[in-house]
Amino acid sequence: MKKPNHSGSGQIRIIGGQWRGRKLPVPDSPGLRPTTDRVRETLFNWLAPVIVDAQCLDCFAGSGALGLEALSRYAAGATLIEMDRAVSQQLIKNLATLKAGNARVVNSNAMSFLAQKGTPHNIVFVDPPFRRGLLEETINLLEDNGWLADEALIYVESEVENGLPTVPANWSLHREKVAGQVAYRLYQREAQGESDAD
């Protein structure tokens, strides 16, 4: 029988914090592309100074790899948006397994949810399905509808071939790396008006 092409199929592993080493099931869903352990390790090293007590928003939660990792590292809370019903149900089960009472799963299309007036978050994860043109629309909805706190950090994962995404003028590129065909970047937001105060 042919083995899967990638190891760890069907589960994610939390790599740091209070739930370090815990493995959690992930449904087999087309297009589900959990952020790799290596990329997550780099990202959460970047976020280490600010993750504790942060309010986090995971716009395309999928496996929950980013939101659950943030909670494991003592984020104050997390909202995980996931459109696929089966995937969102598994996220709810995984949160219950971890006894994570400081998180909620929103079973919704991210664009529809983010089009509403939001509450400010300190850290936002934007890791949309590739090749669907969702990235820049998501970025604009976050900025325009109040989802971002002053000085929020926004993690963006995208295809290398697309180059730098267009971001609001008050976002600055803080960190950037490439892993294979995936570019991952961390942006820092300034409150509107601060960048004009020089």
UniProtKB/Swiss-Prot annotation:
UniProt-listed GO biological process terms: rRNA base methylation
Molecular-function annotations in GO: 16S rRNA (guanine(966)-N(2))-methyltransferase activity; nucleic acid binding
Which Pfam families does the annotation name? Cons_hypoth95
State the reactions this protein catalyses.
guanosine(966) in 16S rRNA + S-adenosyl-L-methionine = N(2)-methylguanosine(966) in 16S rRNA + S-adenosyl-L-homocysteine + H(+)
What is the main EC category here? transferase
Task: Give the EC number(s) under which this enzyme is classified.
Answer: 2.1.1.171
Transmembrane helix: present as a keyword of the record? no
Q: Which UniProt keywords apply?
A: Methyltransferase, rRNA processing, S-adenosyl-L-methionine, Transferase
The record's section on InterPro entries has: DNA_methylase_N6_adenine_CS, RNA_MeTrfase_RsmD, SAM-dependent_MTases_sf
Looking up PROSITE patterns in the UniProt record yields: N6_MTASE
Q: Which family does it belong to?
A: Belongs to the methyltransferase superfamily. RsmD family.
Q: What does this protein do?
A: Specifically methylates the guanine in position 966 of 16S rRNA in the assembled 30S particle.
Q: What is this protein called?
A: Ribosomal RNA small subunit methyltransferase D
List the taxonomic lineage. Bacteria, Pseudomonadati, Pseudomonadota, Gammaproteobacteria, Enterobacterales
This protein's encoding gene: rsmD
